[in-house]
């Protein structure tokens, strides 16, 4: 399946508060495909997130990236300048964990209505802010596999305030892979150690990957991009996501 052509579109997901815009990428060939939710950085569903979504679809998945800042900034998508970082953080600070969970559940319900979907095979991936969101989503019963990239604040906070997201670890029933840079100023190594210990304590099937990089090493549009780390991490993501496939679809 790898490398097959894909189809992309912008979709509207019904939600009890209105609707959520989302970027959808699907394999063009008929089949039965797992679903992967793609969670944005603070920069919205921008070119990088759309590219990741397409890469996942090309590997044989239905991939969908909901706009997580839809309430404050519909269809938000910006770059990586200092001013844009400040803008993205402003919207992040207006987003709560309860809203995110509600949006994720709405996205899963929407995905289940799509043609060629395997509704029992759902995973997620997220980067930066989205890496934190992915850890939060991992505790949902629908999520079987999670890839969380450099999510800051997991042991100390949750979006909008409340108990730290790390407290949801006992509810993770699937497999979670986390990816961190040991030179990331936003995520001290002591926090990475704590996440790893907590996952082990609660017997969550997991792997914690550490790279000698800074923050955002997977994104080739950021100054901390690290080709070797990004390539290695992508191979781990593919291995993880392929566990969702039936033997005849790999």
State where each predicted segment sits:
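N-terminal cap/leader regions of alpha/beta-hydrolase-fold enzymes
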Residues: 1-250
């Amino acid at each position: 399946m790898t490398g097959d052509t894909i189809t992309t579109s912008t979709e509207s997901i019904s939600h009890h508060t209105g609707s959520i815009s989302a970027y959808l990428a699907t394999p063009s060939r008929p089949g039965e495909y797992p679903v992967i939710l793609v969670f944005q950085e603070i920069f919205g569903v921008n070119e990088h997130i759309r590219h990741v979504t397409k890469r996942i679809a090309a590997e044989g998945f239905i991939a969908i990236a909901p706009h997580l800042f839809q309430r404050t900034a519909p269809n938000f998508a910006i770059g990586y300048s200092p001013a844009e970082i400040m803008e993205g953080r402003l919207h992040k600070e207006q987003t709560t964990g309860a809203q995110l969970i509600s949006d994720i559940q709405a996205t899963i319900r929407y995905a289940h209505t799509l043609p060629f979907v395997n509704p029992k095979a759902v995973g997620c991936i997220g980067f930066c802010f989205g890496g934190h969101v992915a850890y939060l989503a991992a505790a949902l019963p629908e999520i079987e596999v999670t890839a969380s990239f450099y999510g800051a604040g997991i042991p100390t906070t949750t979006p909008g305030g409340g108990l730290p997201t790390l407290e949801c670890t006992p509810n993770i029933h699937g497999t979670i892979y986390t990816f961190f840079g040991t030179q990331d100023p936003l995520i001290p190594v002591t926090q990475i150690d704590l996440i790893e210990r907590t996952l082990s304590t609660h017997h969550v099937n997991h792997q914690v990957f550490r790279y000698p990089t800074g923050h955002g090493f997977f994104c080739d549009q950021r100054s901390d991009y690290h080709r070797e780390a990004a390539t290695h991490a992508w191979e781990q993501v593919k291995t993880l996501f392929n566990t969702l496939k039936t033997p005849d679809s790999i």
